[in-house]
Amino acid sequence: MLAVVLTACEKGPVEWRDDTRQLALPVSGPESSEAEAHLVLRADGSPALEPVVTVATMPADSAACPGSLRIAALSPTEIYGAWWSRRENGRAVLFSARSDNAGATWATTVPVDTTDRGTLSCERPAPSIAADSTSGYVHVTYFLNSPTGPGVFFAHSMDRGDLFHSPVPIMYGDRPSASAVTAADSLVIVAFEDPNSQRPQISLAMSRTWGHIFARERPAASTGTTSAERPLVALRAPQLVVGWRNGSAVTARVGTLN
């Protein structure tokens, strides 16, 4: 009886608010996309979309996949980028680089993941990148067909992007899936399209160890929606917000971490 009572009282990893909010993208023009905006949680707990940092130059890579560069700012001057670079036979390499002068110039390109065995080339979702000012770590998530199978993966650097640790699988699955990552010191949250779902849905992966180990649970974030894709995520512990693209707007759901 005790075991039954304890099980019934267990809470999920996130307690979601009942409502969702529609947020307009802070960009204009026919080419506008969520790549030009990032999700934030204000001090009052309300979600908002803000323009991403802009850079004067891009990291030098003649094989870079168009539109795949994603940017994260650790400070006004310390900027990180991650992008796909095409290779032969439909494969791609995930690269990163750091700028110490707000994107005017870039340091040496560093490989994040070179293990792709797929044939998607540049026809895959762009990576996501987050730079945490508290820990100084850089976190990257992406979809790739690895030697152990296709799926969503996570990798991070503990030394200002000079070296990335071996990738960690978030979820294996065949469907190319977009993802988003955010961090606040030891707490890392990954929002991702479920690569096994027939209908696009957003799930979460959580780590309280700077991304070294992720909890086994993959709680759903877009429950109650017919379709959710291209996730966004932001964190102001203990609150987090997850967003997904909905036409010309972003649907956002706020929750509290248990």
Predicted regions and their residues:
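C-terminal motif of bacterial Sec signal peptides marking the signal peptidase cleavage site
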Residues: V5-A8
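Extracellular, repeat-based ectodomains that mediate carbohydrate processing or recognition
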Residues: E10-N258
